[in-house]
Amino acid sequence: RIIMAESMAGLKRTHRCTEVTAAQIGENVTVMGWVQKSRNKGGIIFTDLRDRTGIIQIIFEESDCGAESFAKAERLRSEFTIAVTGVVEKRSGAANENLKTGSIEVRAKSLRILSESEVPPFPIEENSKTREEVRLKYRYLDLRRPDLQRNILVRSRVATMVRQFLADEGFLEIETPTLIKSTPEGARDYLVPSRVHPGNFYA
């Protein structure tokens, strides 16, 4: 279940998570995505923000983001959808070699919770060991996992390349009706009433 929270009015993303690099240190950026995990260390909150490109670390301190945003940051849980505006900094301590953004972090100046989420039925992470029937039941969550997102990206790129090649060769893309036969033990036919022949249906 998703609960809509704050509005996106007047808000515009400047970068996707892994588009933020060391070249932007000192600059203000606005990033959006899902909370992968959030850790409250007492006075400072570390949040891993994830979008389809990867993960970036966000730091919340009340002295930087204000009492209101810090109070909201204390509520963050896995799969909350948030928007953060802040300043890019070199990561304090050792860099995380496992992340593309492992050498930097964003010190939050403001936070908007775009939607809240209940505890997900399985962790949204690569190589999930969750049973397939559970993943299929919550397919909209399963499609957020990095390995499936890569598959979607590859499919999109291949389809775009094929379409562009055919367009360059002078082909037209025309959406025609698809006629298929009924299959034994298949799904029930979807009946569409005919307006020209009352009482008859297309299947």
Regions found by a protein language model. Name each.
Residues 1-4:
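Short, Lys/Arg-enriched N-terminal segments with co-localized hydrophobic residues
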Residues 6-203:
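Class II aminoacyl-tRNA synthetase-like tRNA-binding/catalytic domains
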